[in-house]
Amino acid sequence: MELYLDTANVAEVERLARIFPIAGVTTNPSIVAASKESIWDVLPRLQNAIGEEGTLFAQTMSRDAKGMVEEAKRLNNAIPGIVVKIPVTAEGLAAIKLLKKEGIVTLGTAVYSASQGLLAALAGAKYVAPYVNRVDAQGGDGIRMVLELQTLLEHHAPDSMVLAASFKTPRQALDCLLAGCQAITLPLDVAQQMLNTPAVESAIEKFEQDWKNAFGNLNL
């Protein structure tokens, strides 16, 4: 599987990359805007943080296919091998088809239904990103949608993969993996929740106390 961090915070990527076996970093316009850095400044820094083998994702801003393709080429020139995120609209699907012919790897983003995700995959997107928590927030069932999308891709677009996004809890991420997702991207707060387990700290403290009581120190 592929595990990504959903952030443009370079310092946090460097910190968590030492801990998590991350495959790379995903960004979107809101995430980049929150960083207060120009996208052309922050992307090289993120790539440096994840190393040459890490995969970086960045999104286009244009609403029409021509503009999306032009921006995708610009992103690819700046960071060779970058995966370009394209919103799965009618124009986005047209752009994904064109970029497939150009050899630029894409991710279909802002996916709220299994049918929408399937169309992105059939158009040529390597990755499809369903918004799990946002679907839940609208009264839907994000995990069920992911399961349906995963099944559709396995049957009809096996060269594409689900990269599930938009999580509020580690449980949502785990449920996506149980549904068969090959890739997920975690916001920093959810990644941190996975690390912060009070019961683990309590167990370690008990081990230390028992050892110290027996041997007078904490050395092996």
From Swiss-Prot:
GO terms for molecular function: fructose 6-phosphate aldolase activity. The keyword Cytoplasm applies. It is found in: Cytoplasm. GO terms for biological process: fructose metabolic process. Belongs to the transaldolase family. Type 3A subfamily. The active site is at residue 85. Homodecamer. Its EC number is 4.1.2.-. SUPFAM superfamilies: Aldolase. PANTHER family: FRUCTOSE-6-PHOSPHATE ALDOLASE 1-RELATED (PTHR10683:SF40), TRANSALDOLASE (PTHR10683). Gene3D superfamilies: Aldolase class I (3.20.20.70). It catalyses: beta-D-fructose 6-phosphate = dihydroxyacetone + D-glyceraldehyde 3-phosphate. Catalyzes the reversible formation of fructose 6-phosphate from dihydroxyacetone and D-glyceraldehyde 3-phosphate via an aldolization reaction. The gene is fsa. It comes from the Bacteria. One of its GO terms (cellular component) is cytoplasm. CDD domains: Transaldolase_FSA (cd00956). Pfam families: TAL_FSA. This is Fructose-6-phosphate aldolase. It is an enzyme of class 4 (lyase). The keyword Repeat does not apply. Keywords: Carbohydrate metabolism, Cytoplasm, Lyase, Schiff base. Its main location: cytoplasm.
